Amino acid sequence: MPSCMRPSEEQSAKQKAIDDWLPITSSRNAKWWYSAFHNVTAMVGAGVLSLPYAMAQLGWGPGVAILILSWIITLYTLWQMVEMHEMVPGKRFDRYHELGQHAFGEKLGLYIVVPQQLIVEVGVCIVYMVTGGKSLHKVHELLCKEPCKEIKLSYFIMIFASVHFVLSHLPNFNAIAGVSLAAAVMSLSYSTIAWSASVRKGVQPDVAYGYKAKTAAGTVFNFFSALGDVAFAYAGHNVVLEIQATIPSTPEKPSKGPMWRGVVVAYIVVALCYFPVALIGYWMFGNKVEDNILLSLEKPTWLIVMANFFVVVHVIGSYQIYAMPVFDMIETLLVKKLNFSPTRLLRFVVRNLYVAFTMFIGITFPFFGGLLGFFGGFAFAPTTYFLPCIIWLAIYKPRKYSLSWCINWICIVLGLCLMILSPIGGLRQIILQSKDYKFYS
């Protein structure tokens, strides 16, 4: 029977069918608390465990100031993102690059946002591969007493990746809600273990709070790298519009209400995780703290094993949160631009290849601390600290020297400093660590 639909209607129906298949737009029935634990899972992760180490590189005064300032600035820029999601009546900017295209034009917006967002999301997935593998390795070390065969870190990263070869086939954000909730609970749990176990261990006899580096250059470079560690700890902006896209919206009840409620709850949890871990961890261990606080804690063994296991569960959820927008980008390109059919086979191939790629890079370059500093400044600073402000200024055009104009420009200047300085320190740290590194060890 011939179709009675006009070509335009047929095209529209085809477009809707594709949107219903793509991960970001396929399900819009999320509750406000979904946004809370998705944001906690996206934000609290490997970054919190490096904060005492960052404090050791920054020192008490600058460290506390930067932690608080970052919390305030990123909450403000996250509010901007939530507000701009439905700034055009009848339209939703479901993806970060769609907002960028509205602000800067179709092509320029794509070129500005997509490379940065991909660097962030792929970078996070790689770092979390390393984090998951290292935490599993630590569990093995603590539980397996002599005589015990040494197992390479590479194999633990592979074990961690094997979970994602399964979970990555969940179709959308709402489908991974259970994984994300478990991850959010784990983040609060291992953060509590990290600071409470530090308190139990007490202030170390030889504790020192001065800068660890022997040279002025070393101190400066470590300071720069620590800025990236802090930036890495506030990374949720890269997926916030994609998370908000899952919440239902009507003109009477726009999605920004429940989304903002979830963000506020998430930021309270972030504060409860970050500040105690950063301050107590540094207070107890001083400048000898490891780049992952759990590595500084050896006893009680059962508690540290539990904390590392919680980290594994959490970064499983975090990996999925950051991988979902990447899956969406790749699948959109293949289906809309290259005219592939939206099938399960396509999804199976794309997602398995992505997991395999991040696993391979993680195995090859497992420099945890340096990776945080490098990715933190190079990619997170733009998308988290100042790109939302630039988009806000481009669209709303607040009056020059007004409060909104001044706040946004302050955020832009601070974000630019972070973007320029942090990768320098992070790259130096990677180079120093790589001197003693054997590939696939």
Q: Over which residues does each language-model region extend?
A:
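Extracellular loop-to-transmembrane helix junctions
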Residues: 54-90
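Membrane-interfacial loop- and helix-cap regions that link adjacent transmembrane helices
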Residues: 6, 27-29, 33, 79, ...
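Short, hydrophobic transmembrane alpha-helix segments
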Residues: 51-59, 173-174, 370
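Hydrophobic alpha-helical transmembrane segments
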Residues: 54, 166-169, 361-366
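Membrane-interface "cap" regions at the ends of multi-pass membrane proteins
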Residues: 1-50, 74-79, 93
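Intramembrane alpha-helical segments
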Residues: 169-175, 181
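Residue-level recognition of membrane-helix boundary sites in multi-pass small-molecule transporters
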Residues: 62-63, 175, 258-261
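Central hydrophobic cores of alpha-helical transmembrane segments in multi-pass inner-membrane proteins
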Residues: 46, 71-80, 160-169, 388
